[in-house]
Amino acid sequence: RAVSFTGGTATGRNIMKNAGLKKYSMELGGKSPVLIFEDADIERALDAALFTIFSINGERCTAGSRIFIQQSIYPEFVKRFAERANRLRVGDPTDPNTQVGALISKQHWEKVSGYIRLGIEEGATLLAGGADKPADLPAHLRNGNFLRPTVLADVDNRMRVAQEEIFGPVLAVTTFKTMEEALEIANDTQYGLGAGVWSRNGNLAYKMGRGIQAG
């Protein structure tokens, strides 16, 4: 028999400390990086990056909540990403046309909304979404816990929005120049649940896979 726990990092550490010799399995959240190199298939990378953060309203431990884009393609990629994020349909999750539904509770909505405000205060640039409910929600949904898909660009990896799990539709975007820099910032986190690499260069992708501390 073993102890299995999915939840907060602090609680998981306390369980591990008291588990003694018992086997345990811990899934304690994530801040998964997605690294997009200049030779990537941009259309496929855009599709994947949108899905990894905004599917299931961003309430997924493996959400790609940090995206690192190589400097040479950064302006165009982040512009197109923000445009597509702004077009995602927020609304009733029972409607097949809806792409982003409501967060799990009012308390969690306030937490995620607070992180968006914090990111802006820390110096990030808001390119899509925001901390308020969508203005175009129909009357019967206005009391729901809805947030627009949010893109925070120009994020420094020391910011809290880059280091702490938000667990919502909020993306932190950073740029990098070299593979070495990408590895350094991707690994500069307490989490290591998942990661993604987009490149047509198999050797580069292999090296990144070996170097990223995740999985």
Protein language model regions, located:
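ALDH superfamily catalytic-core signature
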Residues: 2, 8-156, 185-186, 212-213
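Conserved C-terminal structural/oligomerization subdomain of aldehyde/semialdehyde dehydrogenase
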Residues: 35, 89, 139-215
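Conserved phosphate-binding and hydrolysis motifs of nucleotide-dependent enzymes
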Residues: 7-8, 168
